Amino acid sequence: TRGTGAKKILLRAVGPTLGTEFNVPDALAHPTLTLYHGSTVVDTNTTWGGSAELSAVFTQVGAFPLGATSADAALVENLDRGAYSAIVTAPAGSSGIALVEAYDADPGSPPAEIVNISTRALVGAEAKDTLIAGFAITGTTSDTVLIRGVGPSLGTLFGLRRALGNSHVAVFDSTGAQLAANTIWGRGGRGDDNDAEDEDRENDLDAASDRCGAWHLPRGSNDSALLLTLAPG
């Protein structure tokens, strides 16, 4: 978050409900959600407990309901500006699929705002190994978003082992129609060698990264990125 004042955020780690309500196989049976500011634990939750306060926030932000006795996890926090991490863990000896969500619970209260959100996961070429990150644009006007699939730079810049060597990012609407895709961030998928267009694209993406507090991707890397103006949805 950035700006002045606190920002109210809803965080959820949905596991059991993925299985019971959405028939997701191998859903995580008992997620634990822990919020960090740097290395400091801000709050943690294991079972949301059917809280009336949390239920009201679910409704406010348009999140699907959770069963009052489900073992899903949820937190509502008022966060000062800074970088935070929401980490989902499983009990010892278990694993499964979880949905991690972050909602702006007071979107009409600037100047505090959510600037960017990122997630790290192990991905592969098969559909079951795809990382899916959804987002929603509310209101009545279009908004411009920067979407990046960072793989190689995690290794070269941050020393992360097993970093993906060549990432691919695609954006779909709610009907499943593909809106855009990219494999090499400095090229727009044309398949030619237009250096001037490539440089313009890289400059635009660098400027967008600056505006939302993201680091610059190295020129020539096989990371992927898209800068899109999208209608509400």
Name each model feature, range by range.
Residues 1-233:
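A sequence-level detector for low-complexity, Ser/Thr- and acidic-rich stretches
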